Amino acid sequence: MKEYKTPSYEETVKLGERVAKSLPKGSVVAFLGGLGMGKTAFTTGFAKGLGIDVDVSSPTFAICNTYIGEENTLYHFDMYRVDGWDDLYSTGFFDFLETDAYMAIEWSENVYGALPEDTLMIEIERISENERLFKMYKKSEEEE
């Protein structure tokens, strides 16, 4: 497990950018953390690290936002309202796993059983109003 502290929104964005640049195509990142923890800020940087220059917003109502760059695609999911396998199938989640696109998944605890074993799990904890602690590990390493 790797841990990173970010003192501000801007540093959270930069962390997301660095992580994106370190991952191979087709990678899945899954966030664990409540409202206002920095999931969308991290995803903003993640998109930037993939060369996708867009305004990232939480896909709360759309369930999935798609961001397309010249070389990479990012599917940004919010699984908060997903309740069961039927709901998950209707999002296109499993189809997107078969592509070389990147996926960022908010509220991943709701779809934990469907996440690939090599998913990068990112637990976010609030230290103070602006400071966050990010704990990162592969899903397959959780049981160890």
Segments and roles (model prediction):
Residues 1-18:
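N-terminal pre-Walker A segment at the start of P-loop NTPase domains
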Residues 2-3, 48, 86, 94-144:
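Short phosphate-coordinating micro-motif centered on Lys-Gly-acidic
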Residues 20-25:
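Phosphate-binding P-loop
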Residues 28-30:
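Short hydrophobic/aromatic beta-strand immediately N-terminal to the Walker A/P-loop
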Residues 32-34:
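P-loop (Walker A) phosphate-binding loop of NTP-binding proteins
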Residues 39:
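Conserved lysine of the Walker
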Residues 52-67:
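Short beta-strand-centered segment that lines the nucleotide-binding/catalytic pocket of NTP-utilizing
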